Amino acid sequence: MKTEASPGRLHEDVKLIFDKKAPSGRSSSCSSSSSSSSGSSYSSSRGSRSSRRSRTSSSSRSSSSGSSSSSNSRSRSRPRCSGRVHCRHRHRSPPRRYRARSRSYSPSPESSSRRRHYYRRSRSPYRYSRRYRRSPSRSRSRSPPHWRGSRFIGRYRCRFSQSPRRSPRPYRSRSRSRERSIRLSLEEKKYLLNVAKANAARILGVQNLELPESLKEMEQQEERKRRSSSDEEERVRVDLAAQKTPAQVNGGAADDEAETAQTSPKRKQIVFSNNNAIAKPSSSPTLSDSKVTSRADIVPYKRPFGQWVPIGKSSSANKR
């Protein structure tokens, strides 16, 4: 029994094994088919992309050649600016639109937006110099200290008026150094030297005081100047006397007398007579005829308050 049952079981087991392997084969075939289809689709999409690129490149080349030919045919025609591309023509100021019955103009909303866009983009970072920039320590005003006030010129412009700069004050040092010492004349120096001599002699109790070498040099220079001036005066006098002869000396004295006679008025003699009342000698009293007057206080009747009578203590007590 055991031998008969074993081959039947084996046959059933084999069938079961083959039945289990069948779906795995189907899945493998399905996966292979899907992979092949995906590869074919990828290749087809890649080919379509490459074909599109080739078409766009060829069309761009043809359009560029056509545009170049058209630009060459025209006389330097300016290309129009697209919305995305930034061009120089867009940075120009927008045209003004005037009203029908007024002198003033009103910009349209498009032009105002363009103007704002233009001013935002045209402003450069180096518009203001370092001198105008804001510093943390100083005030927030961008103007320098010597620019004060502004004058309105146009819509977007202002001109700053420059205030006059003050001239710097001359520096005055309070210290009396050698470079800026007090200038004294020779006479003032002499006076100060004599005062210093007298004070030193009184303090030390010495009559003849020896001066230092610096002051001695000054005294020696003064003595030399005095001697030279006196010698020059004597030489000039001697030279003048030697040049003149004795006849010229006598003639010079006579000329001096004549000059004095011409310049001085002539004196007239006064004649005294009884008829001439003006030219009479004065009848002034002599010393012998003059009388000596006494003081008014000494004479009793010439006193200002009359005679004063002394009153004793006994008389004042009796009256009471």
Swiss-Prot record:
Keyword Flavoprotein attached: no
Modified sites of kind Phosphoserine: 135, 137
Record PTM: Phosphorylated. Phosphorylation at Ser-135 and Ser-137 mediates the interaction with spliceosome proteins.
Compositional bias annotation for Polar residues: 271-293
Principal localisation: nucleus
Biased composition (Basic and acidic residues): 1-22, 215-238
Cellular component, GO annotation: nucleus
GO term, biological process aspect, one: spliceosomal complex assembly
InterPro entries, A to Z: RSRP1
Region (Disordered): 1-180, 215-299
Transmembrane segments annotated in the record for this chain: none
Source species, domain of life: Eukaryota
Keyword Repeat: no
Subcellular location(s) of the protein: Nucleus
Keywords: Nucleus, Phosphoprotein
Composition skew (Basic residues), residue ranges: 75-102, 114-158, 166-175
Biased composition (Low complexity): 24-48, 56-74
Similarity-based family: Belongs to the RSRP family.
Known function: Probably acts as a spliceosomal factor that contributes to spliceosome assembly and regulates the isoform switching of proteins such as PARP6.
Name under which the protein is recorded: Arginine/serine-rich protein 1
This protein's encoding gene: rsrp1
